[in-house]
């Protein structure tokens, strides 16, 4: 970037996009998780990119934490089959923008336009499994794997995106988020104790959809979803039923008539045996018996592309210590600014914290920085009040009323200005970075 670079403001679907003039030719391409996505051209590289605006990241502590989680994941997960963070910046309006490569289309759109030939199904599944092997090795579960979250370019390179909903690999995990068609049965049955196997189930559903050109389990609601799964797999085995924690769910499942499974070779008669065998290993009721991503890569169906020396795992587990933290917005804000500065390898900013420190130490430093900002803001407000009082000593009562109202405004402005000091260098990097 050059020192004369500046932020340019434009409207996209009624939403303000405020980006540096490094990027031009903005066009909306859709909504991602909690943000609007536009295509653009990077004038430094002349390459197309996708720019995702995070909507109001500091409006609530929940949104701030969610944005922090997505940023941390994008910085940590670096793999050919995962969307890659190329740039991140904070606008003067304090919106956050993620810049990634632009893939052109997604699997959902592709499946709507044409049936996939065998070699494309095989190659796309291989890349999905390759990406999942890496993600799972980092201790991360995607949780929302579906065709629209699988991006593809004109060279058939595939990348998994939207890690905004990803969660820690934790056998006590609760809740569900995935789109119903691709949701693993253990999520519907228990809402807890699920692990990386939920992504394998989702990948299996996507595999079947690529083969047939339509969703395998298009449930209209939870009950119908479970019903059509049992149409193919039969009734869940007793060891799965025994894991159901919800009394109402247990009563529902045990009240259903017994169903025998349909052999996959009968259900998918025209599909090659290796594909049927792998699909059957991915779509297993018991998650403990479901094939892993690593084993699926070694399956005969993946043989044309399988290369054990080129299917990497993560260098380190992702640090989830922040996941249970309940912090105020200003603390998340300081931590977010520091992550942005670290991405651009800019150090030494006032208020910047050491992101290599333990999470507890980061929180302590960020909390202290936020408190210092509030103290500075309060001091500035008092100075403003003193100045107004001095300047307005000879004014009328109405004038004093106006000044008092103005003090409320300047209180708010001063607080915002001071806390934003921690982001000043994140904004200013536009004038310093990549010179």
Swiss-Prot record:
EC no.?
2.7.11.24
Query: At what positions is N-acetylthreonine found?
Result: 2
Q: Where in the cell is it found?
A: Cytoplasm; Nucleus
Query: Which of the seven top EC classes does this enzyme belong to?
Result: transferase
Can you state which reaction this protein catalyses?
L-seryl-[protein] + ATP = O-phospho-L-seryl-[protein] + ADP + H(+); L-threonyl-[protein] + ATP = O-phospho-L-threonyl-[protein] + ADP + H(+)
Conditions for induction:
By osmotic stress, cold stress, citric acid, and in presence of bacterial lipopolysaccharides (LPS).
Q: Does the keyword Nucleotide-binding apply?
A: yes
| Keyword Protein transport in record | no
Q: Where is this motif: TXY?
A: 174-176
- Phosphotyrosine-modified residues are 176
- The record places the active site at 144 (proton acceptor)
**What UniProt keywords apply to this chain's record, in alphabetical order?**
Acetylation, Activator, ATP-binding, Cytoplasm, Kinase, Nucleotide-binding, Nucleus, Phosphoprotein, Serine/threonine-protein kinase, Transcription, Transcription regulation, Transferase
Q: Which GO terms describe its molecular function?
A: ATP binding; calmodulin binding; chromatin binding; MAP kinase activity; protein serine kinase activity; protein serine/threonine kinase activity
What family does this chain come from, according to its entry? Belongs to the protein kinase superfamily. Ser/Thr protein kinase family. MAP kinase subfamily. HOG1 sub-subfamily.
Q: Name it.
A: Mitogen-activated protein kinase HOG1
Per the record, the gene is HOG1
């Amino acid at each position: 970037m050059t020192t004369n670079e500046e932020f340019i403001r434009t409207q996209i679907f009624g939403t303000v996009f405020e980006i540096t003039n490094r990027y031009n030719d903005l066009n909306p391409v859709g909504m991602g998780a909690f943000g609007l996505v536009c295509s653009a051209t990077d004038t430094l590289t002349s390459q197309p990119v996708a720019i995702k605006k995070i909507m109001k990241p500091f409006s609530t502590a929940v949104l701030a934490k969610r944005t922090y989680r997505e940023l941390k994941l994008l910085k940590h997960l670096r793999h050919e089959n995962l969307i890659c963070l190329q740039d991140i910046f904070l606008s003067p309006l304090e919106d956050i923008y993620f810049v990634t490569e632009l893939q052109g289309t997604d699997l959902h759109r592709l499946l709507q336009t044409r049936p996939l030939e065998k070699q494309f199904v095989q190659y796309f599944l291989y890349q999905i499994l390759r990406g999942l092997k890496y993600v799972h090795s980092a201790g991360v579960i995607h949780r929302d794997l579906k065709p629209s979250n699988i991006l593809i370019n004109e060279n058939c390179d595939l990348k998994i995106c939207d890690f905004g909903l990803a969660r820690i690999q934790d056998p006590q995990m609760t809740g569900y988020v995935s789109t119903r068609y691709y949701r693993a049965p253990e999520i519907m049955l228990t809402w807890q104790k699920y692990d990386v196997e939920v992504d394998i189930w989702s990948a299996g559903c996507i595999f079947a959809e690529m083969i047939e050109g339509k969703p395998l389990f298009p449930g209209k609601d939870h009950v119908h979803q479970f019903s059509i799964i049992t149409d193919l797999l039969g009734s869940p085995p007793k060891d799965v039923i025994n894991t159901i924690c919800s009394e109402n769910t247990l009563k529902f499942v045990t009240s259903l008539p017994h169903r025998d499974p349909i052999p996959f070779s009968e259900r998918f008669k025209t599909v090659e045996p290796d594909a049927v065998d792998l699909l059957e290993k991915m779509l297993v009721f018991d998650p403990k018996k479901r094939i892993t991503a690593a084993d699926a890569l070694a399956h005969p169906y993946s043989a044309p592309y399988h290369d054990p020396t080129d299917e990497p795992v993560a260098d380190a587990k992702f640090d989830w210590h922040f996941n249970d933290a309940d912090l105020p917005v200003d603390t998340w804000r300081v931590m977010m600014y520091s992550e942005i500065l670290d991405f651009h390898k800019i150090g030494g900013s006032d208020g910047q914290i050491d992101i290599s420190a333990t999470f507890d130490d980061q929180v302590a430093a960020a909390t202290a920085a936020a408190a210092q900002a509030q103290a500075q803001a309060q001091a500035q407000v008092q100075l403003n009040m003193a100045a107004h009082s001095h300047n307005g000593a000879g004014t009328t009562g109405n004038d004093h009323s106006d000044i008092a109202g103005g003090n409320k405004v300047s209180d708010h402005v001063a607080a915002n200005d001071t806390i934003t000091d921690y982001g000043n260098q994140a904004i200013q990097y536009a004038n310093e970075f990549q010179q």
